[in-house]
Amino acid sequence: MESSRRPLGLTKPSAGXIIKIEAERISPSRLQLLNPIPGVWFPITLGFRALPNSRREKSFSLHKDKECLLPMESQLHSKRDIGTDTTDVPLKHLMASRSSYCPDGIFTILEQGPMLAQSMATISKELSGSQANRPRLGPLPILLKGTQVAMRLFLLGLRPVRYCLKVFMLKAQEGLHLLVDLVRGHNPVGQIIALEAVPTSASLPLL
């Protein structure tokens, strides 16, 4: 009769009771780690929560790990568009098979599409041709256009505009006189007469 009675006070629970208590304390988030998630790897050790000691080395070993999938997308996004080599070694091994992955950690397009390369070539040819065929204006046509613009702006009657134009015309006259002296040493007399025929300050309206 006494052996069938339950002893009073604290008793040491059995191994089965300990496993049951530990299983009840596991949260749903921890239970999700035991299920394989496609796309990611991480090592998880199934066994007691305590570290192995000399008594348990035969029954419990860290080498018997179960590999499960772990999300690596957050790490990949964090390493994106980085110019320096800050990627981890495991990440490099995981991404070595991707064609858009470069060793310096930059995700980029390695080759341009045929249509894109063709269009860029035609655009560059058009730009180079337009620059080559574009006539270069000499100093005399530029001064003539500037004089025409100045004559139109004089009609506005604004003092700041007139002041700026006065300074501009004085600088233009100074450059024109220097240009005449330069042309006299290198060009025939006909071009000198053409340069001297440019209207001076006497033919312009008074400021």
UniProtKB/Swiss-Prot annotation:
Keyword tags: Virion
Source organism superkingdom: Viruses
TM annotation in the entry: none
Coiled-coil regions, chain positions: none
UniProt keyword annotation of Disulfide bond present: no
Keyword Nucleotide-binding belongs to the record: no
Gene Ontology cellular-component annotations: virion component
InterPro entries: Corona_nucI (IPR004876), N2-like_embe-CoV (IPR044311)
Subcellular location: Virion
A Pfam family that the UniProt record links to this protein: Corona_I
Function description: Structural protein that is not essential for the viral replication either in tissue culture or in its natural host.
Note, other: The gene encoding this protein is included within the N gene (alternative ORF).
Protein family per UniProt: Belongs to the coronaviruses I protein family.
Protein name: Protein I
Gene: I
